[in-house]
Amino acid sequence: MAQLEGAGVLRNALLSALNVAAGTSGEPTAVGKQEVRRILVVELWNIGDVVLLLPFLTQLRKSFPRASVTLLARPHARVLLEGTGLVDEFLDDAAPAENWLSLNPLLGGWRDLWRLRRQLRSRHFDLAFQCRLHVREHVILAMSGARRRIGYAFGEGDRMLTDALEVGDPHRHKVDDWLRLLSVVDATPDDVFTKLAVSPDESAAAAEVLRLRGVSDGDVVIGIHPGASLPEKRWPTERFAEVAAELASRPGVQVVAFADPAGIGAELHDVPGVIGLSTSLRELMALIERCTLLICNDSGPMHIAGGLGVQTVAVFGSGVARWFAPLGDRHELVSAGSAQLAGGIDRVTTESVLQAVDRSLAITAARGK
């Protein structure tokens, strides 16, 4: 118990020291809409998390059309958001999360922290936003020196914000978490968002890749991506193969199986009638855009499809669909019940996924697309 209390004291002392070093005040500063010239947004997580930023970034553009928006994120954000016009400047951050989690100075990473502080301070931000319940992001907002630093209340890190919103509804979708932050600056969000952008050249290259592999105009193109960031989010690859084999046997259907950078999904390339592809992130986006439907796990590709307006059949395991469902309403989310039960994703059957595919295709046919 004494050790735990000591760790808590050290953590609080470090947070206090960081806040003092940041030179920030916890009091909100009045910033009129017309005064806002530079905005910082922090999202240091995965591909899907960046895609779920689209509605927030869209509303930020509408509310502050003359402001420059800087996104502090991992390098994939720059690739994903290329061509959307939603971000004026990308700052890449690759600081190890473990160092930030512990706030232990013996683990290193402090030189990177101060380098980042200099980068952010030099931009003189008026507003800064983040919506993680994570001390790392609170520290970054404090280090930015932004006049208004907006996020959610989270333990001792609250002192680093000028506007700390109560978390409130625990069932809220991640998109709504972001949009709710705009209430602090009197912005009223709507349901319209800018989609991910694929250039004409990228689209033409994707079409040619498919044409060379026998895909014709009028074919129903079904993509399958069996990868995911965590093992507990991955439906067994052999069941994806069963789905692929069934769909590939149907007249007028072309199945395209994508392998992820780690090679997950490469086994599907051996399924008779399946087109197997390994791609870059931008190539994957262009190919998904040409699909009628993407079958996948709760993963980055699922969110990419949602960000492109492509319907999905997504298998959920440890993730919670009501928090992390893809953008849009053209999706079938398949799970075996409680995400808390061990082996939940393994209980999802091949038949249930095929039924979801048939429902999605029926809706597409009824809509004429």
Residue ranges and their predicted role:
Residues 1-369:
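Catalytic machinery of carbohydrate-active enzymes
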